[in-house]
């Protein structure tokens, strides 16, 4: 990496001389570059995956199965993550700018909500951002991370070891309240409903990213009755919103 810096390193976790976690640590300490963990059965190695992400790996995905009936489908998750990282590091140029819109007027309520969306590179950044959030933080916190459902629970456990507030997966029908951090935990989209509860839904089905940060942020802008702050740490092109106005909210 130091002599000929690659665009992306595909890093296995299980290697004979040095495992992927240590290799990631050394690369990021000496010659930082984009790293994606690509290993057989990511769900079985969740703790190690997030250890690698803690050192700077940007994402993780199961190794595509070679020789299957549909190679294109098998390779799609890996190719999608590589493309997403290409946008993140500027390999594919600048993203289209969103059309500026007027900010909506605050709604009269004492309820506060912080929503954070992240994609490639998100776990390590989330840990750093949330590490010093105090136990008496006066707002509910909801995270939407582009992460496969198979290791969402592992991410919640990993974050629990990094931050003060308890972290767990969103339960269907609950409300975001102060004193905890909720993480979207399925391959369906997370929505905030008009009654202030959280729900998982398949719609919109055409979304490339599930759960979609864009879909959740739009539902918060539409339904939250108090003060809400949305933070986009890293992300991908927002394919699913119906308009630039919705994207800006």
Language model region names:
Residues 242-249:
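A short, hydrophobic C-terminal helix/tail in secreted or cell-surface proteins
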Residues 3, 8-10, 14-241:
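Conserved acid/base catalytic micro-environments in cytosolic active-site loops
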């Amino acid at each position: 990496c130091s002599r000929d810096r690659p665009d992306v390193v595909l890093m296995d976790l299980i290697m004979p001389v040095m495992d992927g976690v240590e290799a990631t640590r050394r690369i990021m300490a000496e010659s930082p570059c984009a790293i994606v963990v690509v290993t057989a059965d990511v769900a079985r190695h969740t703790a190690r995956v997030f250890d690698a992400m803690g050192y700077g790996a940007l994402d993780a995905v199961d190794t595509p199965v070679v020789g299957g009936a549909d190679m294109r489908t098998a390779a799609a998750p890996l190719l999608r993550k590589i493309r997403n990282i290409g946008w993140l590091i500027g390999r594919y140029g600048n993203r289209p700018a969103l059309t500026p819109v007027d900010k909506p007027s605050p709604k009269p309520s004492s309820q506060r909500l912080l929503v954070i969306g992240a994609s490639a590179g998100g776990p390590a950044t989330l840990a750093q951002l949330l590490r010093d959030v105090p136990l008496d933080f006066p707002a509910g916190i909801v995270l939407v991370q582009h992460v496969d459902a198979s290791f969402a629970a592992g991410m919640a456990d990993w974050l629990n070891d990094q931050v003060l507030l308890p972290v767990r997966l969103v339960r269907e029908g609950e409300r975001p309240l102060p004193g905890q951090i909720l993480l979207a935990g399925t391959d369906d989209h997370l929505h905030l409903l008009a009654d202030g509860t959280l729900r998982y839904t398949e719609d919109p089905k055409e979304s490339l990213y599930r759960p979609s940060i864009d879909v959740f942020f739009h539902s918060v802008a539409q339904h939250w009755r108090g003060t809400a702050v949305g933070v986009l740490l890293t992300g991908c092109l927002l394919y699913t919103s119906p308009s630039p106005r919705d994207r800006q909210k």
